[in-house]
Amino acid sequence: MDIKRTVLWVIFFMSAVMLFDNWQRSHGRPSMFFPNVTQTNTASNATNGNGASGASAAAAANALPAAATGAAPATTAPAAQAQLVRFSTDVYNGEIDTRGGTLAKLTLTKAGDGKQPDLSVTLFDHTANHTYLARTGLLGGDFPNHNDVYAQVAGPTSLAADQNTLKLSFESPVKGGVKVVKTYTFTRGSYVIGVDTKIENVGAAPVTPSVYMELVRDNSSVETPMFSHTFLGPAVYTDQKHFQKITFGDIDKNKADYVTSADNGWIAMVQHYFASAWIPQSGAKRDIYVEKIDPTLYRVGVKQPVEAIAPGQSADVSARLFAGPEEERMLEGIAPGLELVKDYGWVTIIAKPLFWLLEKIHGFVGNWGWAIVLLTLLIKAVFFPLSAASYKSMARMKEITPRMQALRERFKSDPQKMNAALMELYKTEKVNPFGGCLPVVIQIPVFISLYWVLLASVEMRGAPWVLWIHDLSQRDPYFILPVLMAVSMFVQTKLNPTPPDPVQAKMMMFMPIAFSVMFFFFPAGLVLYYVVNNVLSIAQQYYITRTLGGAAAKKKAS
């Protein structure tokens, strides 16, 4: 029993330390395990940010424009010429900056269940405190890029009730004999935006430009539950290496590891619940870059070469821009691997089937809270044989605890004899001190996976359960579930054998309080899962202990 408690305490201590370290990092404090990265004020050059390869646009003609915030160089036309064109669809409200035809603001109006106004979230924004935008331009010469002021082509800016698509077009000034017409196509009910770049050669010589498509974001954190940490930063997906996450810290240290050339896949910016991604046409060769362009500003993008365009001719480059919630089924239908932006970490292989099952249950009951309850019940049923073995072992250990204490008292001055006597007792009573521990350890990956499923699923956002729980992604407003969690843990402690060590006994009594403090700040959906799991565990343990006790009494009577 002491061995089991030791293992459980190690698990508890490591979990507490990891949760605290995640809380430190999510609140901008240095990690306890990784050195703090000192940011420099040196703007990135035109390399791709992959220190290993060093392959990128070495020629000045192919260098990406250095202006990071969209502000024009001093030699260009005054900034007052740029305008913000407001638009609206059934899922978006946004603004396109005519400087570069940049998608500078994008508010998702139907995130979550779309019923509450406070569920709207602004994904792209361009203010003094926060920058996150999507932009495109041309490389390969003095061609139009995101620093040039475009002219809006006259047309509607709102999706009418009888329309399925809305198109917004912008024309660039002629530069280097080239004019660009950029068209955004919004489709009803879709978080995928079509972006078409038409390149017209109005000069007298052939041109060979490249189109760049990038996402620019600062490293400011998004709101996440306290004591939890979710990934924030760029990601690259290709057939070669599949899903590659890149931390801002790795970019700072020039240690970003990702595929730099491909003809498939996508690039993205990922945050809790939401993501954006450029998805170029499959089969089109492109270079991928991830780099730092300001002390706190980063970009991830692709550069796609265009075949030579003769004078008087034009070429079209089409791509898709996803900007929306990380809903797995929707993401799977947009592009291969895009569902991976919903980050489950190292437990993905278990978490994905669990979410699939949770989703199926939700489809049956129509409520995410009850789906969590039923999934927890189902998991407990599947693991009942393991739990039964654990509780039986605990019950047997509880029976021989007085004899163990007597042996400890008898041989307290001779640890070697005490251990030998304990081993003999285990052998005689056919008790395995690891018997109660191993079944619990086997179940831990599943419980951790379900934790990440509930933490990462945007479906919980704005999803009610019953009575006072109106949003499973937010903490319990009246702390009823955390209190129930503490009570259930206290009851479990009482059902377990009392540790022989008084200090250890006090620590076991302190555990419900320590965990409750953390659970006061956890999302209600997570706490609901743990409360239901604890209640079912108590019922299982009580039933098994009572059954064994009855069997032992009958055996003794006979």
From Swiss-Prot:
Listed GO MF terms: membrane insertase activity
Transmembrane segments: 3-23, 364-384, 438-458, 477-497, 508-528
Origin superkingdom: Bacteria
Database matches in Pfam families: 60KD_IMP, YidC_periplas
Compartment annotation: Cell inner membrane
BP term (GO), one: protein insertion into membrane
Topology in the lipid bilayer: Multi-pass membrane protein
Keywords: Cell inner membrane, Cell membrane, Chaperone, Membrane, Protein transport, Transmembrane, Transmembrane helix, Transport
CC per GO annotation: plasma membrane
Primary location group: membrane
CDD domains given in the database record: 5TM_YidC_Alb3, EcYidC-like_peri
Keyword ATP-binding tagged: no
Family stated for the protein in its record: Belongs to the OXA1/ALB3/YidC family. Type 1 subfamily.
Protein task: Required for the insertion and/or proper folding and/or complex formation of integral membrane proteins into the membrane. Involved in integration of membrane proteins that insert both dependently and independently of the Sec translocase complex, as well as at least some lipoproteins. Aids folding of multispanning membrane proteins.
Subunit structure: Interacts with the Sec translocase complex via SecD. Specifically interacts with transmembrane segments of nascent integral membrane proteins during membrane integration.
HAMAP family: YidC_type1
Name this polypeptide is given: Membrane protein insertase YidC
Source organism of this protein record: Burkholderia mallei (strain ATCC 23344)
